[in-house]
Amino acid sequence: MGLRYDVIVVGLGHAGSEAALACARMGLATLGLTLKRERSAVLSCNPAVGGTAKGHLVRELDALGGEMGRAADQVGTHFKTLNASKGPAVQASRLLCDRDAYAVGMQAVLFSQPNLTVREGEVAALVAGGGRVEGVVLGDGTQVSASAVLLTTGTFLQALMHVGEQKEVGGRLGDDAARGLSESLRALGFTLGRFKTGTPARLARASIDWDALEPQPGDTRVRPFSWRTKVEGEGGMPFPRQPSVTCALTETTPRTHAVLRDNLHRSPLYQGDIVGRGPRYCPSLEDKVVRFASRERHQVFLEPEGPTSPLVYPAGLSTSLPADVQLTFLHTIRGLEQVEVVRFGYAVEYDYAPPTQLKATLETKAIAGLYFAGQLNGTSGYEEAAFQGLWAGINAALQLKGEPPLLPGRDEAHGAVLVDDLVTKGVDEPFRMFTSRSEHRLKLREGNADLRLARHGHRVGLLPREALERVEARGRAVTEEVARLKRTGLAARLRRPEVTYAQLGEGREDWPVLSPDVAEEVEVEVKYEGYVAQAARAAAREAESTDRWRIPEGYCFHEVRGLSSEAVEKLTAHRPGTVGQARRIPGLTPAAVSLLLVALKRGTEAPAVCAQPED
């Protein structure tokens, strides 16, 4: 082979960008291959970063030395803390971005990174020999050799787009598909499956009746994702840096649903044209109308794609219905009666590789030096993809440098839970991360991501000494203040739900002056300490005992109080004989297993045999 690199990264979406940057920053000669340079790191669907559990992943990624958090901070236009009325463990940051500016910023980082070469090209085949990857062959016949190859192909493998009866090859509107790589993977012995995703129409901002809608302003107190943004702020650089935008809330109507039901026969989803399973937590509108037939309305959030962008993203209206049907149902929604569509919604089917074919490092079991990350592993979401890309990139680089892998435990990071669930349980639908998937979720909070993971980022060379020292200083400040509160008896008062750390210090001249993030972490540490310890003991007991708890044949899972419809569906389909078997069902959360175990111990919440057939 003529060209030679240490690492080749195939695909430069969110997973590929993080993987390529990690390898290059760790000193390896890295080639990033993409179908179009100008489409690298694009926010393909919603123009936002973060969200429930996703915000946790972004902060963890940043603590390890990743790029997504900083890139989002630079172009944020609408900041929101989700679950703000709930406990700190489930509170999550979501940042609406200037879509175009995000891609421009990430591309500037990629294209200027030392040790990283970005080149356009389609990988037609992998080259392997003796159980080890050797490189790739491009569509034009060019051969490139490498010691490691990372596949981060997103939704592009054998991708097919659907709008009503129309089909077009491509992984994203305006982009082609990766046509030959699936066959190459199969030839090497890999199993592939088929998933689908979708996106809503993009609306003309000027054609929306904003006065008829309910405004949804962002939070006035905003916290950046990245430690680097904080440092830059201390140096005088303002934050936020983009003008803010106000989103708006509307909803579908019975008329909307009637239009959808009358046209289901034109939906590729219900015609049988789409065989891939779609994401449970981001269903198409037509799917929602069928699955939740009794609901008369579904919320729709209208999100401008930038301060000056003419486009609006209607969250909640993903669809693959024909263009004429899309326009008709849009006009039945308040505020959208005269809306103009700039680009219609569509669905994408694509190949994925079941992730049980991977090691914990995301290296494939069959071919040494070959790594999979992102939607190729059956996940959905920018943040899940980015974290996997960083994880795979770090571990590929460490392997080539002869160093031990980076494998934080499930009690250290939501990202570790994500990877562990993927490689041990696999997926039967596009995987989305939730805090409930972690048995240690009380200690895995957004606010302490740096305290948990910064040492790992520094160890692998992605987090500079300055950043680690800042984190260590913050950690010491938290530890010392918690110890002082315990020593003086004030911790007992702070544990009361109605008492805050600020209230404890009122009128006390000797009260220490702490930064807001330190004071907040002190309060959370004190209030959560008992619960965290209790949860850890419960998790240990549960892990030891679950295989001993048998589930009666014909057990009515839908009678178990608190179980989600997803959990009931999975339990009913798999019919586990023990709680231990239930724990190993793909996608079943530790929270659901705990609820099931409690019900079985009580023996009163569900009859052993269902009185009526389950749906």
UniProtKB/Swiss-Prot annotation:
SUPFAM superfamilies xref list: FAD/NAD(P)-binding domain (SSF51905)
Any matching Pfam family: GIDA
Residues binding FAD: 11-16
Alphabetical GO biological process terms: tRNA methylation; tRNA wobble uridine modification
This protein's record includes keyword ATP-binding: no
Keywords: Cytoplasm, FAD, Flavoprotein, NAD, tRNA processing
Residue numbers binding NAD(+): 278-292
GO cellular component, as recorded: cytosol
Subcellular location: Cytoplasm
Coiled coil, from the record: none
GO molecular function: flavin adenine dinucleotide binding
Top-rank lineage group of the source organism: Bacteria
Required cofactor names: FAD
Keyword Hydrolase: no
Subunit structure: Homodimer. Heterotetramer of two MnmE and two MnmG subunits.
Function of the protein: NAD-binding protein involved in the addition of a carboxymethylaminomethyl (cmnm) group at the wobble position (U34) of certain tRNAs, forming tRNA-cmnm(5)s(2)U34.
Family of this protein: Belongs to the MnmG family.
Official protein name in the record: tRNA uridine 5-carboxymethylaminomethyl modification enzyme MnmG
Gene name linked to the record: mnmG
